[in-house]
């Protein structure tokens, strides 16, 4: 059985999606971010990074796998039954989109999230300035998300 250590507002949603697509049975252990938007200490008990996504595979000796790309590869390798493996002709496309999602797309999404949360974390009298700057940055990031890769 795969146990997904699911942290709200994390990349673990993509793991749930892959599990559903591959029809792999799983359980979810839910974790909530604290008021500081950080993962709880309990996630460090599962894996030293203390972040999500992380899975535990109870069918393979309680193997713990962290990082979304590694988890997806693991699930395809051990549970995909040939599904999720690109054909020889599509391997290059698969490599590109995998690298793009991690190296180009995710940094912009993380910055977008930071600029959405930042105004809520500062004193009220600074919020209007941060909102003004943040709105410009958000517009730029959204534009980049729509036009990349180009």
What is the role of each PLM region?
Residues 146-150:
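Conserved small/polar residues in nucleotide/adenosyl-binding loops
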Residues 127-142:
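Internal catalytic-core helix/loop-beta-alpha segment
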Residues 1-128:
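GST-like domain detector, emphasizing the conserved glutathione-binding G-site
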């Amino acid at each position: 059985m795969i146990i997904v250590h699911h942290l709200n507002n994390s990349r673990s949603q993509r793991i749930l999606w892959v599990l559903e697509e591959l029809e792999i049975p799983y359980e979810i252990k839910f974790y909530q971010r604290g008021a500081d938007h950080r993962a709880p200490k309990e996630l460090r008990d599962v894996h030293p990074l203390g972040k999500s996504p992380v899975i535990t595979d109870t069918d393979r000796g309680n193997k713990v796998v962290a990082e979304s790309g590694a988890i997806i590869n693991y699930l395809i390798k051990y549970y995909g039954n040939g599904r999720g493996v690109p054909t020889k002709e599509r391997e290059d496309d698969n490599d590109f989109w995998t690298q793009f999602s991690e190296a180009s797309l995710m940094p912009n999404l993380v910055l977008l999230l930071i600029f959405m949360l930042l105004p809520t974390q500062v004193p009220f009298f600074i919020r209007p300035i941060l909102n003004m700057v943040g709105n410009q940055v958000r517009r730029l990031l959204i534009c980049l998300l729509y036009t990349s890769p180009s």
